[in-house]
UniProtKB/Swiss-Prot annotation:
It is found in: Host nucleus; Host cytoplasm; Virion. It is an enzyme of class 3 (hydrolase). Its main location: host cell. This is Probable AP endonuclease. Its cofactor is Zn(2+). Binds 3 Zn(2+) ions. Zn(2+) 2 binds at residues 115, 142, 218. Pfam families: AP_endonuc_2 (PF01261). Its EC number is 3.1.21.-. Endonuclease that plays a role in DNA repair. Cleaves phosphodiester bonds on the 5' side of apurinic or apyrimidinic sites (AP sites). In addition to endonuclease activity, the ASFV enzyme has a proofreading 3'-5' exonuclease activity that is considerably more efficient in the elimination of a mismatch than in that of a correctly paired base. Displays 3'-phosphatase and 3'-repair diesterase activities. The single nucleotide gaps generated by the AP endonuclease are filled by the viral AP endonuclease and DNA ligase. InterPro entries: AP_endonuc_2, AP_endonuc_F2_Zn_BS, Xyl_isomerase-like_sf, Xyl_isomerase-like_TIM-brl. Induction: Expressed in the early phase of the viral replicative cycle and accumulates at later times.
């Protein structure tokens, strides 16, 4: 279930005006076939990302549904950076998130990723309760990156506390998005195979609270040191999490994450947004070749 973030800017043909998301996905699928790694998943923006504006047009909706069905893709949408239903603007935000969820349903997108805030679990649950569930579309709460806040949601204990509250409140269609760069930035050392295995075994221990069917990953290396609180992604084995394991990859924490993802068939997205299409495709070719070697 491996794939990548598909940016309209870097993947669509020049001059594209009406069906740019579909066009981007078509080019992305063709690229996967070209490098010998047929993609099973993808992540897109259907709104924003920095403004509360829907940016998928009517024609694009029709064609995107066909494209997703044709290639049997698992696609998730990333919410805008304003999608914070536990904020003071929650009435407007909740309405906008509801629009995004309905569009996801309409075009065959399986989930919407929202950034978790560094706030108490009860505030997050109260915000989620304002959103009406949309059948077949999961809201994935993404692990945040922070340094000083009490609630980082990078430890299994805090993840369990949050999802117990979610379950006990009766909320449906809520999942977890684990960003490896974020939990590293928040102070969790996942560089070695053994350190990652310890964290992931603890995650498996709470599968009764948050099942793997409701877990996805943002598979990113990080350009900053562990516990920095700074979110800066890097290509796999090019950042500070796993670069020291580039010549002994099966001893890396990344290898353990790939084992978990494969074992439980979780979607995993590489989030890369480089300067040009050529830079992006060069980086992704190397990364997916590495993943291919893991999966042999």
């Amino acid at each position: 279930m491996f794939g990548a973030f598909v940016s309209h800017r870097l993947w669509s043909d020049s001059g594209c005006t009406t069906t740019c998301i579909t066009n981007s996905i078509a080019n992305y699928v063709a690229f996967g076939e070209q490098i010998g790694f047929p993609f099973k998943s993808a992540q897109v923006f259907i709104a924003g990302p920095r403004k509360a504006v829907i940016n998928i047009q009517k024609d694009d909706k029709v064609e995107l549904l066909k494209m997703i069905d044709k290639h049997n893709l698992w696609v998730v949408a990333h919410g805008t950076y304003l999608d914070v239903p536990w904020s003071r603007r929650s009435a407007f935000v909740t309405h906008f998130i509801q629009q995004e969820l309905l569009i996801c349903k309409e075009v065959g997108i399986k989930g919407l990723v929202l950034h978790l805030g560094a706030v108490e679990p009860e505030l997050i649950v109260e915000g989620l309760k304002k959103i009406k569930p949309v059948e077949g579309v999961i809201i994935y709460l993404e692990t945040p990156h922070n340094k000083h806040h009490t609630y980082k949601y990078s430890t299994i204990e805090q993840i369990k506390e949050l999802f117990l509250r979610i379950r006990n409140t009766g909320l449906k269609q809520i999942g977890l998005c684990i960003d490896t760069a974020h939990i590293w930035s928040s102070g969790v050392n996942i560089s070695s195979y053994n350190s990652a295995r310890q964290w992931l075994r603890s995650l498996e221990d709470i599968h009764s609270v948050i099942p793997p069917s409701h877990i996805m990953f943002h598979l990113n290396d990080a350009a900053t040191k562990c516990g920095s609180g700074v979110d800066r992604h890097a290509s796999l084995f090019e950042g500070m999490i796993w670069k020291s394991y580039s010549h002994k990859i099966k001893h890396s924490g990344l290898y353990c994450f790939v084992e978990y993802i494969t074992r439980h068939q979780c979607p995993a997205i590489l989030e890369r947004n480089l300067g040009s299409s050529m830079q992006l495709q060069t980086a992704l070719t190397a990364e997916f070749n590495t993943l291919k070697s893991f999966l042999k």
